[in-house]
């Protein structure tokens, strides 16, 4: 009898403590779930789009702003035999992140028709890639390509757009722009110097006169990349900028919506140049600055 009583007491002790432990674990789980819920709510605060990806807005983050010469040095090193990227790979990574950011910020139902102005250099190539991805996302895309690049890489990008039924036109007028909900400026990137020349000066003026929302790729076309002056007399007045690799000195004081896209700088380059890169979250290819 005494042995049976002792066994019963032991079982009750285990049961009571198990219940307490279970209650404690439930409390912890509830607390953590609540915290996660808050984080998710903050991540999705603002506009909802047809995209499923999220972005965390980080405040007071450390980020390196690149001079024109350092940006060129890093770009060359990324495509060196030592690192091993190709131009095509970098364009695909950049173009996809551009498309994802646009998809996040400009909902499909309000900004379905997009006109993308592409320049003759790699910035324009990023725009051509973004056009293809945006088409796949369901947007109605037109590319304006006033000065076509005849290199094989760019011809392949144009051929892909043809197979995705994306119209590519040589020019667009102010009246043409009125038909679109959003304009993307992929004319000039970080290698641009001097003042925009014809036909790009007219295009920039036309974009600014359109009163349409404008997104710039890497930098607003026409600005001084090093930011040591107010910029050129004529530059794109965009409402959002998508920096690539790292932001450039010319957009250090950019006070409108600003993203960093691409996520392709390897650790060795970060360490070599002591770069400060904002923390990307999860599988996101971009972060809001």
From Swiss-Prot:
The signal peptide annotation in the UniProt record is none
Q: Which GO terms describe its cellular component?
A: mitochondrion
Cofactor binding: number and manner: Binds 1 potassium ion per subunit.
Q: Which superkingdom heads the taxonomic lineage of this protein's source?
A: Eukaryota
Where does this protein hold K(+)? Answer: 123, 185, 221
Where do the YjeF N-terminal domain residues begin and end?
Answer: 71-277
In the record, what terms sit under GO molecular function? metal ion binding; NAD(P)HX epimerase activity; nucleotide binding
> Which InterPro entries does the protein's record reference?
YjeF_N_dom, YjeF_N_dom_sf, YJEFN_prot_NAXE-like
Q: Quote the catalytic activity from the record.
A: (6R)-NADHX = (6S)-NADHX; (6R)-NADPHX = (6S)-NADPHX
Spell out the HAMAP family in the cross-references.
NADHX_epimerase (MF_01966)
Sequence similarity: Belongs to the NnrE/AIBP family.
Q: What does this protein do?
A: Catalyzes the epimerization of the S- and R-forms of NAD(P)HX, a damaged form of NAD(P)H that is a result of enzymatic or heat-dependent hydration. This is a prerequisite for the S-specific NAD(P)H-hydrate dehydratase to allow the repair of both epimers of NAD(P)HX.
| Protein's name according to its UniProt entry | NAD(P)H-hydrate epimerase
Organism phylogeny: Eukaryota, Sar, Alveolata, Apicomplexa, Aconoidasida
